[in-house]
């Protein structure tokens, strides 16, 4: 089967200036009979050397596309305020030249795969083919959720951005092609449901997000002594800020119950003030702003605390932790769309009281939580395996 992938960004094994890892890992263990040619706008600006490396790793051919001249000038001159005047998001005004369309049609592909929610006009250029459009999230759902958070209203610029972008993405999603030959692929169940509500009758398919990297050999799950190693992975950005502040304020208030039980590590930027506050309170705490080998660093820990306040789709760092044997303790947004079960293969908390209860309980019932971490890892290997998800994606072309 021959597939042509048309993408905003060039795939790479890691996220490079965009979500480039998802298409890479959807292809790396694809069925042996699937041949893929990639046409990329290279919005993430991968170097020629890196592109050749990806071609070799994925056994694909990558051809670069030119961005519309006017968009290049908008980006070069920092004229992004122009987005406010547009009916749709800026990158929705991208399509292929007739010459490129003819070239792709000449390859006689069995299907056209489009990656990136904004380039839906490209999907419409191949009406005679079976098409799968990987979004992978619903941007309108993201802005809808953002407008429901209190912290957004405290920042005038953030509020205005969300107010401007929400209707643009709603309009864009409402005019996605809705025909039997186009299937939309999302990595969020709520995202797929949201798209069906915005565009009734559209074929929106939820597929689990593939996990990325697993340490070899696999980590033996045995919590550290005398202190359990607790990891907080990711930047202290707007996705985590609200829930993280609530969680660590609780830990500061309950310092006598927790400080002798945990060694806390922040892996990411923006946590400096929190590190200082926890240290001053008596916690054993460290910060690593950059790890040369991210997975190796993750594997040094036992529990990952993921206090995510907002977001859509699937959280890659949660998948990384689960796949590498950590017990994940997180909010509903942290664990949504992941094939784990609260109290069986992860711990989901909805309040500071629930978080405190589990953090107090873990040191007293270590074996119970080690088994939970093992079940979490098993669930990810089965339900989020790259080979499995790639096969499911390719099967969409056959339906």
Identify the meaning behind each predicted range.
Residues 25-26, 98-105, 139, 151-184:
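Membrane-proximal helix-turn-helix segments that form the acceptor-binding/catalytic region
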Residues 1-61, 252-257:
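N-terminal subdomain of nucleotide-sugar transferases
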Residues 73-87, 133-171:
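Acceptor-binding helix/loop patch of EC 2.4 sugar-transfer enzymes
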Residues 317-320, 327-331:
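Short hydrophobic beta-strand element within catalytic cores of glycosyltransferases
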């Amino acid at each position: 089967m021959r597939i042509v992938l048309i993408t905003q960004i060039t795939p790479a094994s890691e996220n490079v200036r965009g979500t480039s890892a998802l298409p890479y890992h959807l292809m790396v263990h694809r069925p042996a009979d699937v041949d893929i040619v990639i046409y990329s706008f290279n919005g993430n600006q991968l170097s020629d050397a890196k592109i050749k490396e990806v071609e070799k790793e994925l056994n694909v051919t990558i051809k670069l596309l030119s961005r519309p001249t006017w968009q290049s000038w908008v980006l070069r001159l920092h004229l992004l305020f122009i987005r406010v005047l547009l009916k749709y998001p800026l990158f929705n005004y991208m399509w292929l030249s007739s010459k490129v369309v003819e070239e792709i049609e000449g390859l006689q592909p069995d299907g056209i795969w489009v990656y990136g929610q904004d380039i839906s006009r490209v999907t419409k250029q191949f009406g005679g083919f079976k098409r799968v459009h990987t979004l992978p999230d619903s941007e309108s759902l993201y802005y809808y959720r953002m407008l429901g958070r209190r912290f957004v209203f405290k920042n005038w610029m953030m509020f205005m951005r969300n107010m401007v972008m929400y209707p643009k993405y709603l309009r864009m999603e409402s005019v996605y092609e809705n025909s039997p030959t186009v299937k939309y692929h999302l990595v969020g169940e709520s995202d797929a449901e949201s798209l069906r509500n915005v565009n009734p009758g559209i074929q929106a398919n939820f597929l689990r997000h593939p996990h990325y990297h697993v340490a070899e050999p696999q980590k033996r799950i045995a919590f550290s002594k005398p202190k359990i190693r607790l990891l907080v992975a990711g930047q202290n950005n707007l996705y985590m800020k609200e829930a993280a502040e609530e969680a660590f304020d609780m830990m500061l208030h309950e310092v006598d119950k927790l400080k002798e039980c945990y060694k806390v590590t922040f892996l990411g930027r923006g946590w400096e003030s929190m590190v200082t506050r926890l240290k001053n309170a008596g916690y054993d705490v460290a910060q690593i702003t950059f790890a040369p080998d991210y997975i190796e660093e993750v594997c040094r820990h036992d529990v990952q605390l993921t206090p995510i306040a907002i977001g859509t789709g699937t959280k890659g760092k949660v998948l990384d932790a689960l796949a590498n044997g950590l017990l994940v303790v997180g909010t509903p947004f942290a664990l949504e769309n992941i094939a784990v079960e609260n109290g069986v293969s992860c711990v989901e908390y909805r309040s500071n009281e629930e978080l405190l209860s589990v953090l107090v309980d873990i040191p007293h019932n270590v074996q119970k939580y080690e088994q939970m971490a093992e079940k979490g890892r098993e669930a990810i290997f089965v339900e989020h395996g790259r080979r499995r998800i790639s096969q499911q994606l390719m099967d969409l072309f056959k339906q």
